[in-house]
């Protein structure tokens, strides 16, 4: 919010200074002169020291979004085609690990056993479990049962029971690229209430993903998730 206010204030001051009546003693300036001065003093969105004049159509569009008050990503976080390929390969391993868990998870299994499945499969596929050792985190995955919200730590004394729902959160590093996803599992015969919760959550994910597209807004994704959850009585 603070950054947004700063952006709006700077835009207001800029426009006020440009639109105020000129002093009768100042030399007349053309609109072209005003535009050139504005371009000299406004830094490029990408952080370069070049003048604001857009270098590509992409830069022009980003600059326009910034002028409208939107927060725009710095060029440093934009990925090259090669980086996107690397992230996708890491994601393939991440999904393969979750598929491996799906093939073995069952009632009576401890969450520590799930953790070992994740560790062994990730290493077999050439990856590294990203959580392991991160800021002292002791395990390769996170397991959250029933009402546990997220990031539960696997343990030898926590076993799955028939009727549980459990989220397994997997993060993978492969060739220095990170990927992350989680999956909900229904253990045995779960109640209709739990099944409906899992189904609606998956539907929310799919609707949110439909909003992930070039020139879309991050808020559109969140709004799609929120609207669908609320429609079904969830928050």
Task: Place the predicted regions along the sequence by residue.
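Active-site neighborhoods and metal-handling regions in enzymes and metal-associated proteins
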Residues: 12, 16, 20-235
């Amino acid at each position: 919010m603070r950054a947004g206010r700063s952006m709006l204030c700077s835009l207001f001051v800029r426009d006020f200074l440009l639109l105020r009546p000129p002093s009768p003693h100042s030399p007349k300036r053309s609109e072209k002169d005003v535009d050139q001065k504005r371009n000299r003093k406004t830094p490029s969105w990408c952080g370069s020291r070049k003048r604001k004049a857009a270098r590509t159509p992409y830069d022009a569009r980003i600059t326009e979004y910034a002028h409208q008050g939107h927060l725009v990503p710095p060029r440093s976080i934009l990925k090259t085609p090669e980086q996107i390929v690397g992230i996708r390969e890491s994601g393939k391993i991440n999904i393969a690990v979750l598929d491996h868990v799906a093939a073995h998870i069952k009632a009576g299994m401890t969450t520590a056993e799930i953790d070992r499945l994740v560790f062994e499969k990730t290493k077999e596929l050439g990856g590294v479990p990203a959580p392991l050792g991160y800021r002292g985190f002791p395990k390769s995955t996170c397991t959250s049962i029933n009402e546990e919200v997220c990031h539960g730590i696997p343990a030898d004394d926590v076993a799955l029971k028939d009727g549980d729902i459990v989220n397994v959160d997997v993060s993978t590093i492969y060739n220095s690229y990170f990927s992350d996803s989680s999956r909900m599992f229904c253990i045995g015969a779960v109640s209709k209430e739990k099944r409906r919760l899992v189904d609606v959550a998956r539907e929310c994910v799919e609707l949110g993903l439909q909003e992930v597209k070039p020139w879309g807004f991050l808020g559109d994704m969140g709004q799609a998730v929120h609207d669908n959850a609320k429609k079904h009585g969830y928050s």
